């Protein structure tokens, strides 16, 4: 009986720990505003400050947003997911919510007041959404609407993707399709002839290593903001070429 009680207590403690962790990672609703850009097909949202390039081919689609400076956090927020709902405006709001991925920066415009055109100026939290995403919660003619937002887990198909660009002694790895928190905080790389080496964030979710790794199979460790790490061992074969994409593990 004592053993069973101890097991139940341990299970309950683990559940409470996970609940606290989830609450810390994905907080309560907060207030912001949202606008839209990129056109009806979202073609104007391609590229962006996170480095994801063609958002169709990298799997992000049209449910994306550019974040204001305070949310973007120098690129550390790239890949994070947010649930947004239009906030209590019967004329301009639509019911329901939409989940978007952070793929770009909405730059500040200090020539305009924060509440009249300088929507993305610090310290305002603001989402400049891809037009198709905005139209799921707001009316086109509104232009800008008040929203409530919260961080939510990212849901992805398949594993984390590593696209190797650059050249010898300058390996630039784009990390995409990250589930869970989505926002990569650190990356390490290991060649078949080297130990683990930390990479530095070059820009967005492009991570840089200056080691010579040509001809080696490659492994990656990816850490996200909730403290978890995924290791993808030998995910890149020795015969890799620059420009190729490889799929590893997932959160």
Swiss-Prot record:
Expressed in lateral root primordia, adventitious root primordia, coleoptiles, shoot apex, leaf primordia, panicles and flowers. Residues 47-159 form the Expansin-like EG45 domain. One of its GO terms (biological process) is plant-type cell wall loosening. It is found in: Secreted, Cell wall; Membrane. Residues 169-248 form the Expansin-like CBD domain. Residues 1-24 form the signal peptide. Belongs to the expansin family. Expansin A subfamily. PANTHER family: EXPANSIN-A15. This is Expansin-A2. It comes from Oryza sativa subsp. japonica.
């Amino acid at each position: 009986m004592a053993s069973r009680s101890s097991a139940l207590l341990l299970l309950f403690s683990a559940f409470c720990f996970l609940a606290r962790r989830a609450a810390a990672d994905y907080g309560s609703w907060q207030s912001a505003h949202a606008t839209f850009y990129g056109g009806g097909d979202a073609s104007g949202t391609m590229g962006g400050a996170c480095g994801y390039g063609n958002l169709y081919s990298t799997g992000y689609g049209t449910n994306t947003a550019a974040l204001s400076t305070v949310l973007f956090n120098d690129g550390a927020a790239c890949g994070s997911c947010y649930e947004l709902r239009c906030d209590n405006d019967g004329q301009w709001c639509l019911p329901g919510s939409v989940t978007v991925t952070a793929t770009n920066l909405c730059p500040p415009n200090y020539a305009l007041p924060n509440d009249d055109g300088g929507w993305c100026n610090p310290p305002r939290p603001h989402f400049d959404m891809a037009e198709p995403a905005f139209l799921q919660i707001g009316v086109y003619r509104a232009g800008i609407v008040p929203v409530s937002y919260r961080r939510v887990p990212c849901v992805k198909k398949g594993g984390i993707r590593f696209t190797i660009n650059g050249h010898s002694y300058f390996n630039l790895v784009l990390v995409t399709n990250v589930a869970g928190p989505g926002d990569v905080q650190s990356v390490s790389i290991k060649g078949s002839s080297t130990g683990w080496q930390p990479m530095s964030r070059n820009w967005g979710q492009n991570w840089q290593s200056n080691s010579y790794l040509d001809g080696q199979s490659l492994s990656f460790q990816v850490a996200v903001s909730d403290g978890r790490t995924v290791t993808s061992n030998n995910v890149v074969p020795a015969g890799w070429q620059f420009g190729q994409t490889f799929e590893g593990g997932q959160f």
